[in-house]
Amino acid sequence: MCGMVSATRWETAIEVTPWIAAIAEQVPLFGTDGIRGRVGEHLTAPLAQQVGFWTGQVLRQAGGDRGPVVVGQDSRNSSNMLAMALSSGLAAAGVEVLHLGLCPTPGVAYLTHHSEAIGGVMISASHNPPGDNGIKVFGADGSKLDRQLQAAIEAGLRGQQTSLPATTWGQHYYQPQLADHYQAAIAQSLGQRANLQGLKIVLDLAWGAAALLAPRLFRELGAEVIALHDLPDGNQINVNCGSTHLARLQAAVLEQGADMGFAFDGDADRVLAVDGRGRSVDGDHILFLWGRELEQQQQLPGQAIVTTVMANLGFERAWQAVGGEFVRTAVGDQYVQAEMQARGAMLGGEQSGHILCRHYALTGDGTLTAAHVAALVQASGVSLADLVDQSFRPYPQLLRNVRVEDRDRRCNWQNCAALTQAIAAAETDMGDRGRVLVRASGTEPLLRIMVEAEEAQQVEHWTTHLVQVAESHLL
């Protein structure tokens, strides 16, 4: 029967899991990239249903109570189950659901923005292992939902929010063909450069969301494509492949004599490249090359690039040397996006491969970025390897992860005197020729320790020492 759905009624369907305990303790569900956790332990079908219901409620209130919600998913074995559970919650909130099936995260964002939807949801845990999954929510403009609306969803889950009456139950429509519009939009964004004939490109699809779309796009653009891990496979997504494991792509580029290669993560919102010599090309180099091209085209206001605290010092100093403005934010593409919007900047991203170009999209888009890098190389008349050599020399940098299951110790690592003293000693030793960055991951139970300096020996020494201190005092 249609009518008011009370918070009490919906709250009783939530299983008592560590994740729900976190809600009761007022800990935010939304991390740096949506809700994420271990399926069956932290992330369950009942919870996904609740998230769907309160997402529908919040988006209805924010979007004028009109329009559908676009839902997509990656290839994980749990993604369809969670998408169905979430969609049932959306429908119970009176929201129509347009289900894309397998689709990259930026495709969901694009189609949300261009289908008069009140929002979008992606079921994915990005680069995480197959047993994890997550829920990313987008506003009507295709950008990640702001913190205020995320908090409203969390309040609903705690029974602290009043629900709107549903005048009718929402309907569910399976429309995978809508992803074709996203693919066409990427090709159109290249303009007169939408011709990659003569380029041999290796793509590592990570058994994920771009497994079908990206090879089809590059072939239609005229490139010769060698595709790796190019089937949607929920058992193997991100396993020793994709943007976090470049070795197979590097070997394939060399074996095939390819001009370049691109590696995506499971939901294809990030990408890293490999040049024709088999060297990795990270987000810093991609930003430098694309930024220089946009500046030459007078499409980079203030010559500003927005990136994060993880960006290499060599990148920063090289960009400043050519007169550019270099802006750092906290780690997380939503922080980059917010700073870009505040400054009117058009290009930003992360070393990890989340690249945002607001000329074409409001979120990181691995497939679009790869297409533009390939087109940039084609137009330059020289190889990607040569372009990288002409850009900047990165400082030696090491990033090590320490697994700290205790959330309080991980998130409050600054309270560990031994670790803060070791960091201070490293900073004193390196001076302005290096830096240390320690932070708790927003997506995994990891403490990330990064050391960067002009001298590789210093980097190795201090990284090893800091990891040892962290393991001795935080585990």
UniProtKB/Swiss-Prot annotation:
InterPro entries: A-D-PHexomutase_a/b/a-I (IPR005844), A-D-PHexomutase_a/b/a-I/II/III (IPR016055), A-D-PHexomutase_a/b/a-II (IPR005845), A-D-PHexomutase_a/b/a-III (IPR005846), A-D-PHexomutase_C (IPR005843), A-D-PHexomutase_C_sf (IPR036900), A-D-PHexomutase_CS (IPR016066), Alpha-D-phosphohexomutase_SF (IPR005841). GO terms for cellular component: cytosol. Its cofactor is Mg(2+). Signal peptide: none annotated. GO terms for biological process: carbohydrate metabolic process; peptidoglycan biosynthetic process; UDP-N-acetylglucosamine biosynthetic process. Mg(2+) binds at S126, D265, D267, D269. Binds 1 Mg(2+) ion per subunit. GO terms for molecular function: magnesium ion binding; phosphoglucosamine mutase activity; phosphomannomutase activity. It is an enzyme of class 5 (isomerase). This is Phosphoglucosamine mutase.
